[in-house]
Structure formats: C-alpha cells, structure tokens
C-alpha cells in the first residue's frame, strides 16, 4: 500500500525544476503545511466525501483562490498515483470548482492621477519615475523594478518587457504573453529619457546599496502611503496604477480590447473584458433610447 506522502513528495520533486520560485514556494507550503494531515494515509483510502468536508471547513479560513490552489495540488498528487495504478479513481474529479469572485477594481480618476504626479515632485526622482512608468505604461510593478536601460529604445519609442522582479528574485514575467513591447507615450518620453541620462547603473531602480529592488515595499511604505494620506486619497496598492492605465486608455482612445490585452501582457482578452470593459460599462449612464440603430 502506498502512502499519500510518497506521491506528495514525488509531486514536489517533479515540479522542482519546472516551476518558478514563487510557484515552488507556494506548492511546498501547501503540501507541507496544509496537506500534511494526509501524509500517513494509504492513498487509496482517501475518499472524495472526506475531502469535500475538509474543503468545506477550509472555506471558513481561506478564500476561493487559495482553495483552488489546494485543489490543484491534490489533483496533481492523486493523478500521479493514478498513473502508477495505486488508485483507479481520482477523488478530486468529484469535487466542484470554487467560484472565484474577484473584487471590483477601483482605479484612480484623471484628476487624482494629475494630483498624485504633481505631489510626487516632493519625493525622489526615482519615485517620480516609478509612478510615471506605472501610470503611462500599465506595466506590472515587478516588471518596472526589473527594467534596465538596455530594455528601452528611444528611437523606436518602445520599452521591451522581458523580466520581472519579486521577493524570489528576477524571473521571466507572469506568462509568455507578458514578454512584450510597450509604447512610450509623449507624456512619458522626455522625462524617461532625462532620467536614463542621469542613471549610471543599468537598472533604473536601485537601493542605497546600488542593487535592484525585489519588491515595491520601500516605495509603498516611505513614499506611496504618505503621499496618498497627504492628499486625502483612499489608499490603494501601487498595482492599481495598472488598472488606471487600462481603464483610461480604453475610455479615451480607439484602442481595441485585443490591442490592450497585448499591451498589458495578458494571454487573452478575457481579463480585459471581465475586468476593464465591464468596469467602464458599469460607469456609463443609463442606455440612451433615442439612438438610431439603422
């Protein structure tokens, strides 16, 4: 009889060289801290009903996204056991997926963006440029932190997004579609060019030790939070700059959802429609009935 732990360890070992560091950390934490209560069980003795009960109890502690991660791990572990003929049925097949309700985005208004950028002039040039890149390119914060001068082509007015930084270091961006080109708009061009001229290190954003930042923690704690507080603007994460860019470029230009999905580095238009187009539609006035259809 094979134990659950045997296949759980195999799952981690197989993924060790395939996953990004962040994914590896997440799955290791789930297997060792959440699923370890199954370790000594014979894998064929684990039933769908008891897993369903466990997930029901977990709903009181964690959200749907985390539950989906738990389910994904279990599914892959049981699938390995099925491949090895240790079980004939994967109990996860009998569990329904958890409905994921994403919180509604709250982008900044046009006037708030102007006020924020103006007020940021009291802070470092580094922080000012971080905000301008966020608001004028829609790049993810990790992608901005990984940006090097060699990734910027001022002649073609393009930024080449190739890497992203996080607490796990520097890696390829979120998806294959995230490796992309982002246009440098007029409002950003001169400021970015000037900033690069007086940046003597390849990375655009480095700390006092001349090393690139891994997270936006310092910007958030020492600049972003105090800035919003001083302006009486409700706090939102720096990542909301990306949502602000997306909603405003959809509202104010002729860009299509497909083109926007490519600018943002999404693998499909689904996110653009579900998040940004839907948000804009909800902001519109009541449907005008005096229009001429034909």
Task: Map each language-model feature to its residues.
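Basic, Lys/Arg- and aromatic-enriched nucleic-acid-binding interface segment
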Residues: 68, 83, 87, 94-141, ...
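DNA/chromatin major-groove-contacting recognition/catalytic segments
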Residues: 115-119, 170-172, 180, 274-294
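Conserved tyrosine-mediated DNA breakage-rejoining catalytic core shared by Y-recombinases
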Residues: 146-194
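Active-site/catalytic core of tyrosine-dependent DNA strand-transfer enzymes
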Residues: 185-234
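DNA breakage-rejoining catalytic core of tyrosine-based enzymes
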Residues: 44, 87-89, 100-118, 168-185, ...
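C-terminal catalytic core of tyrosine-transesterase DNA break-rejoin enzymes
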Residues: 83, 132, 136, 142-143, ...
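N-terminal core-binding DNA-recognition domain of tyrosine site-specific recombinases/integrases
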Residues: 2-8, 12-79, 84-86, 102, ...
